[in-house]
């Protein structure tokens, strides 16, 4: 199994480094991908969650599903199809994968680079519903970025205020305010700007220094407290923590492509656009 996973992670890493094969749910570093599929990938065994096609003992196609059994959904890793292979190979991988998963999964999500035409055609042939467009933005380590004195780490007495702000700002997201609180540790933190009445704004950051990976997962400012520079202050605080305290060189975040004001805010804080992405949903019935 170890050699099998190493071969798959190498194949995915090489493919995902190219925009025309890029899938947003997985990275492009072999060691990080290997760690994820070995320890964090899917609620089901890897053998059930990844379909692979070979030709002359060489991998020519991979499609994985990061399954959440709790809600019957999965994020698609792929399809990754070797150049020169027919597009129908992606459909063969799909049939293989969905046959294994059966009724354990009813909804699949795809998140693909706009230049990934194979994935776009694949989604269209499956009758997927196209969702919103997103930007993946990166910020690289800068000198002199410090955490503003207005910013504090979330304290226990502000937990209720944080949950209220987060759940109102992101009512339908994948992680509730309570979920975030359960994850907090030395690599996952919430920073806030507060008043006596409660939290004006917050940012939730997640770092994986062993893989040089850091993300700004959520950021929100109370609507009554906007236009005070709080968003920029929080973004810079997040970068200072991830860059300086965890030693992460590149920080990423995903932004709705239609949120021009947010994109400008992140640009002022040091982020730049690196990928333009499309989101898809495939619902299956049995």
Segments predicted by a language model, with ranges:
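Short amphipathic alpha-helix that is part of the acyltransferase structural core
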Residues: 1-35, 134, 145-173
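Active-site rim helix/loop that mediates acceptor-substrate recognition in acyltransferases
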Residues: 15-16, 24-49, 170-196, 204
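Conserved donor-binding loop and adjoining core beta-sheet/short helix segment
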Residues: 32-92, 203-217, 222
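Conserved acetyl-CoA-binding loop-helix of GNAT-fold acetyltransferases
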Residues: 85-99, 125, 221, 227-241, ...
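Conserved GNAT acetyl-CoA-binding A-motif
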Residues: 101-113, 242-254
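Conserved active-site alpha-helix within GNAT-family acetyltransferase domains
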Residues: 114-132, 232, 257-275
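Glycine/small-residue-rich hydrophobic helix-like segments
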Residues: 180-246
């Amino acid at each position: 199994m170890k050699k099998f996973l190493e071969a798959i992670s190498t194949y995915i890493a090489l493919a995902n480094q190219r925009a025309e094969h890029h899938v947003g749910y997985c990275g492009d570093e072999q060691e990080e991908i290997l760690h994820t599929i070995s320890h964090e990938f899917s609620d089901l065994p890897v053998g059930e969650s990844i379909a692979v096609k070979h030709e002359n003992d060489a991998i020519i196609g991979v499609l994985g599903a990061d399954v959440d059994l709790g809600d019957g959904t999965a994020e698609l890793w792929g399809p990754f199809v070797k150049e020169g292979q027919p597009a129908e190979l992606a459909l063969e991988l799909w049939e293989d994968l969905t046959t294994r998963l059966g009724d354990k999964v009813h909804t699949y999500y795809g998140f693909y680079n706009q230049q990934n035409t194979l994935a776009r055609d694949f989604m269209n042939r499956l009758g997927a519903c196209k969702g919103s467009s997103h930007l993946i933005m990166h910020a690289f380590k800068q000198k002199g970025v410090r955490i503003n004195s207005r910013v504090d780490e979330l304290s226990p007495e502000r937990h209720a205020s944080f949950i209220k702000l987060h759940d109102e700002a992101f009512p339908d997201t994948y992680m509730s305010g309570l979920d975030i609180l359960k994850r907090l540790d030395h690599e996952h933190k919430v920073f806030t700007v507060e008043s006596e009445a409660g939290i004006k704004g917050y940012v939730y950051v997640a770092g994986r220094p062993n893989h040089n990976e850091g993300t700004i997962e959520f950021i929100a400012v109370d609507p009554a407290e906007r236009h005070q520079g709080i968003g920029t202050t929080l973004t810079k605080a997040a970068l200072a923590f991830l860059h300086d305290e965890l030693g992460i060189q590149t920080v990423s975040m995903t932004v709705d492509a239609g949120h021009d004001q947010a994109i400008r805010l992140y640009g002022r804080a040091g982020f730049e656009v690196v990928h333009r992405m499309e989101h898809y949903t495939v619902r299956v019935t049995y």
